[in-house]
Amino acid sequence: MVSLRDNIESQPLSHNRRIRKNFGHINLVADIPNLIEIQKNSYEKNFLQLNIKDSERKNKGLQSILNSIFPISDSSNIANLEFVKYEFDTPKYDVDECSQRSLSYAAPLKVTLRLSIWDIDEDTGTREIKGIKEQEVYMGDIPLMTKNGTFIINGTERVVVSQMHRSPGVFFYHDEGKVHSSGKLLYSARVIPYRGSWLDFEFDAKDIIYFRIDRKRKLYATTLLRAIGMSTEEIIKFYYNSVTYKFVKNKGWSVKFIPQHITAHRLTSDLVDADTGNVLLKAGQKITPRLAQKYFGVGLNNILVTHETLIGKYLSEDLRDPASDEVLAKIGEMITSDMLKVINDLKIKNVNVLVINPQSGSYIRNTLFADKNQDREAALCDIFRVLRPGEPANIEAAESLFYNLFFDAERYDLSEVGRIKMNSRLELNISEEVTVLTIDDIKNIVRILVELKDGKGIIDDIDHLGNRRVRSVGELIENQFRIGLVRMEKSVIERMSAGDVDTVMPHDLVNSKILVSVVKEFFSTSQLSQFMDQTNPLSEITHKRRLSALGPGGLSRDRAGFEVRDVHPTHYGRICPIETPEGQNIGLINSMATYARINKHGFIESPYRRVKNGYVTDEVVYLSAIEEGKYKIGQANSKVDQDGKLQGEFINCRVEGGNFVMVEPDEVDFIDVTPMQVVSVAASLIPFLENDDANRALMGSNMQRQAVPLIKTEAPFVGTGVEGVVAKDSGASVLALHDGIVERVDSNRIVIRTLEQKVDGSPSVDIYNLLKFQKSNHNTCINQKPLVKVGHYVKKNDIIADGPSTDNGEIALGRNVLVAFLPWNGYNFEDSILISERIVKEDVFTSIHIEEFEVIARDTRLGPEEITRDIPNVSEEALRHLDEVGIIYVGAEVKAGDILVGKVTPKSESPITPEEKLLRAIFGEKAFDVKDSSLHVPSGVSGTVVEVRIFSRRGVEKDQRAIAIEKQQIEKLAKDRDDELEIIEHFVFSWLEKLLVGHVIINGPKQITAGQTITTEMLKGLSKGQLWQITVEDANVMNEIEQIKIHYDEKKYALDKRFTTKVEKLQSGDDLPQGALKVVKVFIATKHKLQPGDKMAGRHGNKGVISRIVPEEDMPFLEDGTVVDIVLNPLGLPSRMNIGQILETHLGWASINLAKKISTLVKEYKDNHIDIEEIKKFLLELYGKDINYILEGSEEEIISFCNKVSKGVYFATPVFDGAKVQDVKDMLELAGQDLSGQVKLIDGRTGEYFDRLVTVGHKYLLKLHHLVDNKIHSRSIGPYSLVTQQPLGGKSHFGGQRFGEMECWALQAYGAAYTLQEMLTVKSDDVNGRIKTYDSIVRGENNFESGIPESFNVMIKEFRSLCLNVKLEVTPSK
């Protein structure tokens, strides 16, 4: 067999990755999890359960909804529709086709349903199966997720953002004393289900307990307890302990001594031991719980109390006459002096009373006695009247309503999470499958609420991440599906009842449009389905990892208070404390931390390393916020010796509530995995983050997402080590799917022969078509460039092509530039930035932006619109860029106003004069009955046409241009097919030759005689077809050849079939919107060079606008003649406190000078002045042991590595574990630079040195997408507002600049009366005046007259709307 590893370069491509000098001290035991798995797991694994056999699907997501909705039965129970299984067909169009054709990337959902028809005997009521019909029913197209975790909806890429909401369960809290004027705490409890009615319990100022359902009118809590079937006696027994008072003759009453019921107070009567009669404490003396416990310990069991003590106590059972058994007082009643007299008179020996004291209040008893309802029926009717006001209350309706509210699984669902939270809070042990409320739940909620009021236990923290959970994309769409299926269920029941069930098939009953419309609505209009932020790869990743507290079922930004927005201790390692928007959404929209993941219950988990007996292990455990509270967790930078033992007498640990304690090493349970786990992806890309103020770090995180991809990408010299992970997970770069060898490479595609053999031993071929100059959602340019060469050996998941904003597999949002911190003639006042002309000349910050323009030719009432070059009243000059069809050529340079696509629209006929008739007769019909409706380049846009796409309706004849584009696409498909076939053929025929050589021929083509032994030369002259004709003696070889032939033919057939399918799809025409005959899309690329007014920023929140571009000769320069690229204001630092940028500048300075030193060493080596060992020694000193494998390689490899760092040495300084000031100094020293990081700088204008040393260094700067070209605009002519007749405002309306109230004051202050009058009349809304002014300008005159502005007429109209008839009387001037 042919070796698959022929001609492989010895090193895999992964060895070409960039090596960074890493300053981190902590060894990583856990890799950063895939950054977009939150999206993919939620939708594909948990919701759709794609690629899982039907029998192996778990009851979750789509499967669980279908199981819960089906079976559906009709009202008479004759027909029954059951769910069997579901599956997805392959999507009609792939991702790229959907993007181009403005379609949704979706797969048809096919659900197998079984319709059972029953025969019911009317006499006996017995049922028999009459017939069963099983059928696969189409339930609509369900959007699929792309490999990057996005959805394509109507051709645009969208992201469904995860939502943070309050977890289902029960929560206890108080009003913080805000409601009642006395500041009294009013406690309340709320049961929040996943789906269903909310149930609230609350205290009022008089300590009566109420409940509400869905925030409606409140009722007494005991009404609810009665409604669930509790009697007065059961209520009192459940919530109170009782104690018995026994009558002791001539002494009073004896009662059991319970020290727990004693609070510190002064005795009003003596404390007497009932058993011995001893006085233990005199009246007036103080008793404390501790003293009470002491007496109890020495045998005090019962004490004597006076008769009066019983007054004010509450009975714990009915008080009965011993003789007649007549009820004298009911349970719960208060003992009064009259009742005590009756007790004494009737010689009742034992009286049972409730234990009500400061530790156990009388709230339930008081509520019972305030409540008028005495039985279950009355309570249910009372609840019914509140929920259904106006409807007559009967017991059946009331019972049914109450049951449906909380105990019916179809209408009420706590969810598994809700049940777990409920069980843990109420200390119950109810099965997790019970997702409705139970009687025990309600009883215990009231019990805990009362205990809180009594000062036992603590309230819940709503902002604790154990009480907030994440609803990811799968769950959000699951909820929409449920809504759609419930609506569909109603229509199925109606159809069952309406028609003849015997003749109906399942597909007749199901109307899939209901389901499809709900799903479509969610993806198109939901607040959580958002247009993807595609400015650069980082903004994509951040958008997919975003957590929003807004949206349906969440908070609204107007009502969200400070607490919800604030950072909470449980955010540690779960939600980034830095990255959140500035403005009204601050704290409501967050980003997940780098290492965080979401568990099956929707709670965010963070990883920790387990510590056993003071030794740190490599076992990584993910803990949620609830679990984390049980442990003591040390920091990642805790000192550890070589064996992993924690060093030091005490370790600083985090415990529940966000507090820190010092504990011994043996008591530590876990330590953090890495300090980076605290922050999000964007924040982890900021080097020296630990030296920046948090507010500026927030701006830095947010502005990195606005960086525009540049033409020339460059990774930062000073990075954090995360750059590669971001580039890989974002999907911007192209990853190898399998191990393989690169066969062909050009700028458009990469062809790789894989090393993973099929069953037949043949290789498969991977073809990667690269994206070239595609438009992103934010009009930035998506372009991929290959990194591999022919013959390279690549491993699976190696990066083989760079995408936008990536450089050699690392994210590269900006450029490394030489900056100096220096004031320069006031041009860097207020954060302005001064740049050198070199930056513009060499396209350092030049970016390409692509705009899309679309024109649709429709079928109108008067006839079809036509795309044509033949446009009335348009000069040949204006048509110079159009082809014969009327569509612009690719490559044409266009500016505002140019025609992109010529189009004419029929216009309605109007009566014509004899002269027009004559003209028509001479010049033909065309020009008169159509009007020009061509697509022009809008104002402010210019550039090069890079692509034209034409879509024609099915059945409409294609024009020449469309056929030419189609031909190009077919040629591309054919090339892919031919290349793949060629690689397979090369392999198959090499293998065939190897099998045949050395064997004796029995039969073969004419030029070969039988009986010969086959040689390689003999086979060279044969065609591929003739090779198959050869037969040899060895039967095993012939069997193998036959197998190869079968597999080869199958492969060839599959390739041809795939090719013909794609060609048919191209030629068949397109699905266009209603009434559209043809759609033409034109893409214009614009090069934006850096210019004054553009916004730039660093990674530390240091932003500014370019104020001036200075010629290179005027810029400050170094002593060696190097000109500084950018001059920044030193005053931008002290008050902003983002010192990280200075450390970055110093390390960047070291990077450049180390690179110079390495280049010098290489030059000296090439000139034979030094040995390779000198270079090795220097590299070892710089990088340490990280590059041993390179130093052990050949001299060529070492020199090749040195050449890669000739522009700058790459550093990684991980956040919170990076380079310290001393490390920066060490690098500067190694580079032979002053440790201050400052140099002598020469002024380019005078040639003299500046007075003092200046901080200079390489810094990473970004160009943000706030470009001056898209902001600045001025109005010449344009539209006016209809009512006020004033010019409109804003760039999109081609509006003017408003001369507002304050500007009027300015003119008034200067007394510029005529200027003011002109501004308020002819330059604004004096309609006649401005027409006359225009006329006078045309005539060359300078005079104008002001009339009445339209706003005056508007004011008069408003007076009249107030019934004040104001008239303007104009007196003629004399």
UniProtKB/Swiss-Prot annotation:
InterPro entries noted in UniProt: DNA-dir_RNA_pol_bsu_ext_1_sf, DNA-dir_RNA_pol_bsu_external_1, DNA-dir_RNA_pol_su2, DNA-dir_RNAP_su2_dom, DNA-dir_RNAP_su2_hyb_sf, RNA_pol_bsu_bac, RNA_pol_bsu_CS, RNA_pol_bsu_protrusion
Catalytic activity entry: RNA(n) + a ribonucleoside 5'-triphosphate = RNA(n+1) + diphosphate
Gene3D superfamilies in the record: 2.40.50.100, 2.40.50.150, 3.90.1100.10, DNA-directed RNA polymerase, beta subunit, external 1 domain, DNA-directed RNA polymerase, subunit 2, domain 6, RNA polymerase alpha subunit dimerisation domain, RNA polymerase Rpb2, domain 2
Intrachain S-S bonds: none
Enzyme type, top EC level: transferase
Effect of residue 299 to S: In strain: Breinl
One Gene Ontology term from the biological process aspect of the record: response to antibiotic
Any single GO CC term annotated in Swiss-Prot or TrEMBL for this entry: DNA-directed RNA polymerase complex
Keywords (A to Z) from UniProt: Antibiotic resistance, DNA-directed RNA polymerase, Nucleotidyltransferase, Transcription, Transferase
Effect of residue 273 to Y: In strain: Breinl
Family: Belongs to the RNA polymerase beta chain family.
Subunit: The RNAP catalytic core consists of 2 alpha, 1 beta, 1 beta' and 1 omega subunit. When a sigma factor is associated with the core the holoenzyme is formed, which can initiate transcription.
Protein known as: DNA-directed RNA polymerase subunit beta
Gene that this sequence comes from: rpoB
